[in-house]
From Swiss-Prot:
It comes from the Eukaryota. It comes from Saccharomyces cerevisiae (strain ATCC 204508 / S288c) (Baker's yeast). This is Uncharacterized protein YOR381W-A.
Amino acid sequence: MFNVALPSQDKKSEFYKQKRLSLRTNILDEFLRVAKTQDNRQNNFVSQYRNDEIY
């Protein structure tokens, strides 16, 4: 009886571990996406400023 309960418990914890990992990955992806967007905005601003200087 005890042995039967263990695999399901392992499966459950494995499932939640995967859930946590995918959530963490999603959060990291989102963070990187936002950071990249901010970086692009900053670069666009700087290049815009340089273009204004030239003309």
